[in-house]
Amino acid sequence: MYDEALLQELTELENTVRFDSFDFNDAYVLGSALRAAGEKAPKPIAVRIVLDGMILYQSFLPGTDATNNNWMDKKQRTVQLTGTTSLRAAVERELYGAKAPWQRDEEHYAFCGGGFPLYVDGQFRGAAIISGLPHLKDHALLCETVKDYWESKK
């Protein structure tokens, strides 16, 4: 299902979309933008922005439930462990195998789209996470919105 071209595309996106600054207000603005994008999506989504281990923004659209919260927890763990998108973790696992114990732990980690790393001034600082759509659509909505916000700050 996945290939090296997708892995390269994800790596380039992660290496490009890095913030010079990102604070509490940015978390609110980005989270609100993700929620607004989710309101236009065909299914409801949940949104979370984490910075320095703190959840600075979290919102659940009507129709989401505890399952979405559970998926966001898994995606957050995956992004925090890898410093990459949760989709990249899925692609690498499929292409190269589950070599590390965490790569076989689907109870605690997510191997699907919906988690994006937040790098600030060159350092990994947190994640933007959504849940609710089919995972590739989660990834697309998330990446498009994060990239748009990043471009607005340049």
PLM features: residue spans?
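Structured interaction and signal-relay segments at domain junctions
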Residues: 39-104
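Extended aliphatic helical segments
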Residues: 17, 29, 47-50, 79, ...
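Sensory/regulatory domains in signal-transduction proteins
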Residues: 97-135, 140
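Juxtadomain coupling helices with adjacent low-complexity linkers
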Residues: 1-33, 37-39, 125, 131-154
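General "foldedness" signal
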Residues: 48, 61-63, 69, 130-132, ...
